[in-house]
Design a protein with these regions (language model features):
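A late C-terminal transmembrane helix in Major Facilitator Superfamily
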Residues: 354-391
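Extracytoplasmic gate region of multi-pass secondary transporters
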Residues: 34-35, 227-286, 343-350, 354, ...
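Helix-breaking motifs and short loop linkers at transmembrane-helix boundaries and internal kinks
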Residues: 46, 78, 99-105, 116, ...
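Helix-loop-helix hairpin linking two adjacent transmembrane segments in secondary transporters
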Residues: 144-195
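Conserved MFS/SLC helix-loop-helix module at the cytosolic interface between two early adjacent transmembrane helices
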Residues: 65-104
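Cytoplasmic helix-loop-helix junction between adjacent transmembrane helices
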Residues: 109-149
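Extracytoplasmic
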Residues: 15-49, 120, 249-254
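C-terminal ends and interior cores of transmembrane alpha-helices
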Residues: 88-101, 310-326
Length: 431
């Protein structure tokens, strides 16, 4: 029995990771574009901080609501079709945003952007699950997650350069058209695992060490019964803390540096990139550490859980001093370490699914967990906008963010103690 990927599998692993890496970068450039143009758009169109907070939030509401059914839909129709359609839809919405001026129309475009991007992270989890052995999924999952934060690091200097050269509207259109082109390439080149005739050695490599799982499609009854499991609720509520902090910094960091720290637009682009580079590093480090400790004999589920809890705690600890320091250097350093820690935790949260959930439920549980994260992410921008309008400061907003992360670490610690069980197998045992 072979425990190594064949040359053909390695080729498909490379194709899959390359697509997800590029799509992840475009995905988060789309999300970051509004936060980068935050001050420019609010001045040009006359929007308040609360209105901008709402614009930044509605993306997450559309995204979060689609997370609940997206896993079941992807399991029924396949990753290739659903992700390809989502990539095309979100890129079209991004392109159209560059043509709009009405607050209402911008709200609608942002909601559609969120709906289109809904399959992205569940697709990453499913693709890694399909093409990698369970003992080797930490690093590829880290790379998939890293693409998003790498884009967040690229976004400030790249998007500000585009905005200064062509204006904010053309910036939106350029990024949107790039995504439309990638969606066409995805449809042409990507293949679902079921579309290939794998050899026995390839199947042995892919399935070795994985928990047994039924190959039947997930029914609505089985999907609904997942919510009876305590660990799933821990994942949903706990991931709120990850989503809240990620989205506070993603949506408001450029405005924070401009308004609270007095940086110019050009300088903001480069300084804002630093914390997101640390976030990308946190994802990559987590992937390496997760694979290392498992290969050294650590329990796959418990090790991920501890990394989540510690990551959330350190993220809270670094965010608090950023709220009170008078030094711009110290604030950026603390925020950088907070983003390193929160993305270290977030990557472990996705890795937790890969080692604690039966294969056929991977996309369903991924979507449900992501729903939790984006509920937190939905409220972070609007709550921050309201706090800024009321206090004319980011201090309270950062304190709230740190508190949410701390509480999320407690939820993971006390609630996530058992693997997710397959409802089909539970029914068989009770008969």
């Amino acid at each position: 029995m072979s425990l190594h990927a064949s040359k053909r599998l390695k080729r498909w692993q490379l194709i899959a990771l390359t697509f997800l890496l590029i799509a992840g970068i475009i995905n988060f450039l789309d999300r970051a574009s509004l936060s980068i143009a935050n001050c420019t758009i609010s001045k040009e169109l006359g929007f308040s901080a609360t209105q901008m907070g709402l614009l930044l939030s509605v993306f997450s509401f559309g995204y979060a609501l689609c997370q609940l059914p997206i896993g079941m839909v992807m399991e029924r129709f396949g990753v290739k079709k659903i992700y390809g359609f989502g990539l095309f839809l979100w890129s079209l919405a991004q392109t159209v945003t560059g043509l709009l001026s009405s607050f209402t129309h911008l709200i609608i475009a942002r909601v559609i952007l969120g709906i289109g991007e809904a399959p992205h992270l569940p697709t990453g989890v499913k693709v890694v699950n399909d093409w990698y052995n369970i003992r080797e999924r930490g690093l590829p999952m880290g790379i998939v997650n890293m693409s998003s934060t790498l884009a967040q690091a690229l976004a400030p200097p790249l998007l500000i350069a585009l905005m200064l050269a062509f204006g904010w509207r053309t910036m939106f259109i350029i990024i949107g058209i790039s995504g439309i082109i990638l969606s066409i390439l995805w449809f042409i080149f990507y293949r679902n695992r079921e579309q290939l005739e794998l050899t026995d050695d390839e199947l042995n490599y892919l399935n070795d060490g994985a928990p047994p799982s039924s190959t039947n499609k997930v029914s609505f009854k089985e999907w609904a019964s997942l919510f009876k499991q305590r660990s799933l609720w821990g994942m949903i509520i706990g991931f709120n803390g990850v989503g809240y902090m990620v989205w506070l910094y993603l949506t408001w960091l450029p405005a924070y540096l401009e308004n609270s720290r007095g940086l110019s637009l050009e300088k903001t682009g480069w300084v804002a990139a630093i914390p997101f580079l640390f976030g990308a590093l946190g994802m990559l480090v987590n992937g390496v550490v997760a694979d290392y400790v498992v290969k050294r004999g650590a329990d796959k589920m418990k090790s991920r859980k501890w990394m989540i809890c510690l990551g959330l705690l350190f993220a809270a600890m670094f965010t608090l001093p950023a709220a009170y320091t008078d030094s711009t250097f110290s604030a950026v350093a603390c925020i950088s370490m907070a983003l390193f820690s929160i993305h270290f935790a977030g990557t472990s949260a996705w890795g937790l699914i890969l080692v604690s959930v039966p294969s056929r439920l991977i996309t369903s549980v991924s979507g449900i967990q992501n729903f939790g994260g984006f509920i937190g992410g939905s409220f972070a921008p609007i709550i921050t906008g309201i706090i800024i309008d009321q206090t004319h400061s980011f201090t309270l907003a950062l304190v709230v963010c740190a508190t949410v992360a701390f509480l999320a670490s407690l939820v993971y610690f006390f609630f996530v103690n058992e693997p997710i069980k397959d409802p089909a197998e539970m029914e068989v045992k009770t008969v």
